[in-house]
Amino acid sequence: MIVVLIGALSIDIIFGEPKEYIHPVVFSGRVASAIEGYFRKFDNRFRAGILFSIAVIVLTAIPYFLAVYLSSFILVVYVVVSMVILKTTFSITSMGEHIKLITDSLKKGNIMEARMHLSMIVRRDTSRLNENEISSAAIESIAEGLVDGYITPLFFFVFFGLPGAFIARIINTLDSMYGYKDRKNFEFGRFSAFMDTVINYIPARISWFFITFSSDILNYRSKAIPVRRYIRRFDSVNAGWPIASMASALNLRLEKKGHYIVNDDGYQPGVADIEKSMKIYYLAAYSYIVIFVLPLLVIMAVFL
């Protein structure tokens, strides 16, 4: 498992995201779109949503784990296939690529372009956001992305192997597609949102340590705000942990209008703060491997 993990990390660093036609996030989205109409015909939308979520996970998993099974007869091929599939469950490099598009646009003074790039990674309406609000949304996305796009899948990889990481990633995809509180998805997507809350519960709290640790190493943290004070302002029981931790790390006022404000007296965020938050993100990501993931994999390899 350690070799598979190191290989997957190397693929991310060297090659970045795989092509869409082999990416499970893209494939699961296509599967969901293809079968969604059938399940929406049921009167009980909540139960339909449960069956739908299970169906998407199973149908998405079949070709990937069939590939793992078929490759298992040749060890080298099996390891390489496992590396590639594990890589598809998490991402480090792509976050930096998305964020760079936003910061480059802001540096050029092109607010419209920055809004457009931001809209690719957030759910909120970006059409009227100013530079500070764009910066806040980007930093919040970096903080949340550390959890659901990285810490969570590798957390489940440690304890449940490749299937755990893979399923965690598909659950996150389902939540991003259907975990809304609008009329269309409130009942239908409730199970997807619930599963996402469950799998991110521990990783979100782990993120507090790694964001704080990384900001201290980088000598960024100038104000320690009580994270617990702000997590209750979020609808999600998980989102507040990484976002409030990042606000504390950089002493920033992070705000989603009409929803929450974190660190009311903090500085208004700007482009430089987005770049600092990315440095925290990278250091937190790699320190998580060194401090948490690898030691646990070694312990489990020796004693289990």
Swiss-Prot record:
Main localization of the protein?
membrane
Transmembrane stretches in the record are: 2-22, 50-70, 73-93, 147-167, 284-304
Which biological processes are named by the entry's GO terms? cobalamin biosynthetic process
Which Gene Ontology MF annotations are present? ABC-type vitamin B12 transporter activity; threonine-phosphate decarboxylase activity
- Return the GO cellular component terms, semicolon-separated: plasma membrane
InterPro entries under this entry? Cobalamin_biosynth_CobD/CbiB (IPR004485)
Highest taxon in the source lineage = Archaea
**Does DNA-binding appear among the keywords?**
no
Membrane protein topology class: Multi-pass membrane protein
User: What does it do?
Assistant: Converts cobyric acid to cobinamide by the addition of aminopropanol on the F carboxylic group.
Family recorded in the similarity comment? Belongs to the CobD/CbiB family.
Q: What is this protein called?
A: Probable cobalamin biosynthesis protein CobD
In which organism is this protein found? Thermoplasma volcanium (strain ATCC 51530 / DSM 4299 / JCM 9571 / NBRC 15438 / GSS1)
